[in-house]
Design a protein with these regions (language model features):
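Structural recognition of the beta-strand scaffold that forms the well-ordered cores
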Residues: 30-33, 101, 139-142, 155-157, ...
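Flexible glycine/proline-enriched surface loops and loop-helix/loop-strand junctions
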Residues: 89-96, 106-108, 145-152, 225
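Active-site helix/loop module of the DD-peptidase/beta-lactamase fold
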Residues: 2-44, 89, 117-154, 158
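Active-site Gly/Thr loop motif
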Residues: 137-141, 188-248
């Protein structure tokens, strides 16, 4: 809304470090929709996967012995920004925009983009632009990577009641208690689902029969007409919004294994 960014441009137009990476050929909108055509597969259980070997250590998860103790200069991939710029490559068989394929690297590119444009760490942007305007009962906190950079892909910690406040603001198209927090146009666009959006999800065989009709602007869309959508966390956390019924629900979970929106239990929750 401020004119600082155009979603039709590439992230590399704003972050030169991404030149030559998988994110050089995509638009910001494709990143927002998880349709960026990355060669990197997000696998949480295979210890030989790229996630275990490179992304998880950069995220400071410390899955690998000694990973959390690595010092700067001892690896080309130290923090998440290194991983995004130096490791993630494009999938030559999947053009950008063709297929929905959830990948956490997209979220971290967006976090980097926000931080670069606002010229301050992501946690300070969230604090100043969103959290301070919600009348939150408690402080939130955010995880950092191995380089002490706030990460966007996960690790945002808040109470259920404060998360519900955020959901109410999203339901009301960016307004909370009469104060404008986020642009209405942005929060209307997220449910402006087009045929190309539903086709992108249908092309992923894992989601072709799912309840979701599309994924747009980092939200899972259930019903565009009812403006019904969700934010879903890796271990079963959900913020559910239905503007037609004026509903917001939040539930937390502590599922030991990574949750899947395709799991049989998930539609039962909804």
């Amino acid at each position: 809304e401020s004119g600082q960014l155009a979603v039709s441009k590439s992230p590399s137009d704003y972050i030169p470090e991404l030149k030559g990476s998988a994110f050089d050929r995509v638009t910001i909108q494709q990143v927002l929709d998880h349709a960026s055509g990355l060669a990197f597969e997000e696998n949480y259980v295979d210890p030989k996967s790229d996630f275990f070997l490179y992304y998880a250590p950069a995220l400071n998860l410390g899955y690998l012995p000694g990973a959390a103790d690595l010092q700067p200069g001892e690896s080309d991939i130290y923090g998440v920004y290194d991983f995004l710029a130096r490791f993630v490559q494009p999938d030559p068989e999947t053009p950008p925009g063709f297929r929905f394929d959830y990948n956490s690297a997209n979220a971290d590119v967006l976090g980097w983009l926000v931080s670069r444009l606002m010229n301050k760490p992501l946690n300070e942007v969230i604090r100043d632009e969103v959290w301070s305007k919600l009348g939150a009962e408690h402080d939130a906190f955010i995880a950092v990577d191995r380089a002490y950079i706030p990460v966007a892909t996960g690790g945002f910690n808040a109470t259920a009641r404060d998360s519900a406040r955020f959901g109410v603001m999203i339901r009301d198209k960016g307004v909370f208690r009469g104060e404008r927090v986020l642009p209405a146009s942005w929060l209307e666009h997220m449910v402006d689902v087009k045929k190309s959006d539903t086709e992108a999800m249908a092309r992923n065989p894992n989601y072709s029969q799912a309840d979701w009709i599309a994924y747009q602007d980092m939200w899972w869309i259930l019903d565009a007409q009812a403006e019904e959508f969700c934010a879903v966390g890796i271990h079963g956390q959900v913020i559910y919004v239905n503007r037609k019924t004026d509903t917001v629900m939040v539930w937390f979970s502590s599922q030991r294994d990574a949750a899947s929106t395709l799991a049989p239990e998930f539609p039962i929750k909804l």
